[in-house]
Swiss-Prot record:
The chain crosses the membrane at residues 9-29, 40-60, 68-88, 127-147, 154-174, 223-243, 245-265, 285-305, 306-326. Keywords: Cell membrane, Membrane, Transmembrane, Transmembrane helix. It comes from Methanocaldococcus jannaschii (strain ATCC 43067 / DSM 2661 / JAL-1 / JCM 10045 / NBRC 100440) (Methanococcus jannaschii). The lineage of its organism: Archaea, Methanobacteriati, Methanobacteriota, Methanomada group, Methanococci. This is UPF0104 membrane protein MJ1595. It is found in: Cell membrane. The keyword Cytoplasm does not apply.
């Protein structure tokens, strides 16, 4: 008989799914279905196009950052790597946090870019995204401090956690000796339990490449930083517009400010989530947050389900296909 391996992530995913079903049942499945039946598919398609455009923007930003370092990378490969990164983010605990290392690793394989340099590009991306996100969410938290929100303490805790994590990473980068000690200890631990060969020379070489590229970033001109920030902000704007379009698909008019606030709250709530892509936690917070803005629970639940389709299910499928293509390309390179 074939044995089925059940992981902790699978169990958590099932529990989260059942929890969402319970919330849907409490709101009224018949009410939610009634709202979904009247969905305008044209707006959903537009939302999906925006989702693809977000990936294009992320790819353009990454290519720009790589170009700053004096390297050239094929846009198709970068786009596939971004899709693969989204796939990995969607199947790992918390939100938007698991795919960067894989993207950097496969970038070095596909484009023959030094590993340390490849990792520095995704670190710069992460710092940009996190800084902009923390800045925006600080205003949202301030708004809810004044107006009141049931889960305000949870949001503040998530913000502090993300800020602290970012500060620790920046502190490690600023202290080369400490970073080397940390990376070597983690590498030894991983190699011990994952049957990888520990090569300290390669690790130290990658760290040196990483620092050389970070120095290069530090000396860049202002306009190049502005372009990178602009593309990062555009990514968030497109994400918010995508969610707003899903309301229009249900013929429900809602302010962009409301959608922006809930979008940021939902991302923030997923920081402390232990389920893949914040599944369950983020959905619950999204429904409750929209309800706090006096949006009918049935509409809030319907939009949440549509958002999962557009922002989670379809990108996960595309990301998996992208990962298969990337692995095939790498196998071809090995065969040459």
């Amino acid at each position: 008989m074939m044995k089925i391996k059940i992981t902790k992530s699978t169990i958590l995913l099932i529990i989260s799914f059942l929890f969402i079903l319970a919330i849907m049942a409490y709101i009224g499945l018949d009410k939610i279905i009634k709202v979904l039946i009247n969905t305008n598919p044209e707006y959903v398609i537009l939302a999906f196009i925006l989702q693809i455009l977000v990936s294009v923007i992320l790819s353009a930003r990454w290519k720009f950052i790589i170009k700053i370092l004096g390297y050239s990378a094929n846009f198709k490969n970068i786009f596939l790597l971004v899709l693969m990164g989204l796939f990995i983010n969607n199947i790992t605990p918390s939100m938007r946090g698991g795919g960067e290392a894989f993207r950097a690793y496969y970038l070095s394989k596909l484009e023959e870019i030094p590993k340390g340099l490849a990792f520095s590009t995704v670190v710069v991306e992460r710092v940009l995204d996190t800084a902009i996100f923390l800045f925006f969410t600080l205003f949202v938290i301030g708004y809810f401090v004044v107006t009141g929100f049931k889960y305000l303490e949870y949001l503040i805790l998530s913000w502090i956690f993300l800020f602290s994590l970012t500060a620790i990473i920046i502190y490690l980068i600023a202290n080369k000796g400490l970073l080397i000690k940390t990376v070597t200890k983690i590498s030894k631990f991983i190699c011990k339990y994952c049957s990888y060969n520990y090569d300290e020379t390669k690790i130290l070489q990658s760290i040196e490449e990483f620092y050389n590229s970070m120095k290069f970033f530090k000396n860049k001109r202002g306009w190049e930083v502005v372009v990178a920030i602009f593309l990062s902000v555009m990514r968030y704007i497109f994400d918010i517009l995508k969610l707003w379009l899903l309301f229009l698909s249900l013929s429900y008019v809602v302010s962009v400010i409301c959608v922006s606030a809930v979008y940021l709250i939902t991302l923030l709530s997923g920081v402390l989530s232990i389920t893949p892509s914040g599944f369950g936690t983020a959905d619950t917070v999204m429904i409750l947050s929209f309800s706090a803005f006096n949006i009918p629970p049935s509409v809030a639940a319907a939009v949440t389900l549509l958002d999962r389709l557009v922002s989670y299910i379809l990108p996960t499928i595309l990301g998996y296909i992208a990962m298969l293509i990337i692995k095939r390309e790498i196998d071809k390179k090995k065969g040459k």
